[in-house]
């Protein structure tokens, strides 16, 4: 399936996604985070992502920019569970992944700089089926990440980008992605309804 078809199929599955059953896993999240998760009109990516996982059935997921863990928690609520999720985020005064209070046998949180490859020891990044770039939302950082990680992109991997229209720098990188830089064969702008600040779904 194309990036657009995958995006729309996951949106269709969202119609039967039980958000109420997920809320207990988010019990440590603040009210703002909960409101974002519940908002499917401009911020639907949270409920959409577990449905995307159900559609593509990845074995390995890498998330760059896990923060306090809301996105990770939502991914881990997918009906499909036969995957490992590696999520990395910078140290945040002990707040990193602080919303993740339940135990998930397939969740591997990493605290560190995603530009330091020493954080990925014993992890074969080339086996990643689904990537999510959601770190500092700056042109400089995203370029560095793509230059570093694109060599690990395997054919047909799905790569998602948050906040692609949030500033001129992020827009510039997205424009280059659309032109095929870093090896992408397809792209789909899913800003509406996934995230008002921009959301891109690509395929290698």
Predicted features along the sequence, with ranges:
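Rossmann-like AdoMet
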Residues: 1-40
């Amino acid at each position: 399936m194309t990036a657009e078809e995958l995006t729309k199929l996951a949106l269709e599955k969202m119609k039967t996604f039980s958000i109420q059953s997920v809320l207990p896993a988010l019990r440590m999240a603040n009210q703002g985070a909960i409101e974002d998760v519940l908002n499917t009109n401009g911020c639907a990516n949270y409920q959409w992502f577990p449905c995307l996982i159900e559609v593509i059935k990845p074995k390995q997921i890498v998330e760059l920019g896990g923060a306090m863990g809301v996105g990770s928690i939502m991914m881990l609520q997918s009906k499909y569970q036969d995957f490992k999720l590696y999520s990395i985020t910078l140290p945040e005064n002990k707040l990193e992944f602080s919303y993740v209070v339940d135990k998930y046998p397939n969740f591997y949180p990493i605290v560190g700089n995603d530009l330091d490859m020493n954080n990925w020891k014993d992890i074969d990044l080339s086996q990643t089926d689904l990537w999510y770039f959601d770190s500092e939302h700056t042109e400089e950082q995203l370029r560095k990440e793509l230059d570093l990680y694109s060599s690990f992109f395997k054919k047909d991997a799905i790569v998602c980008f948050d906040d692609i229209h949030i500033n001129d720098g992020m827009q510039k990188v997205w424009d280059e992605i659309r032109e095929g830089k870093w090896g992408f064969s397809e792209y789909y702008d899913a800003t509406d309804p996934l995230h008002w600040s921009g959301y891109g779904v690509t395929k290698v």
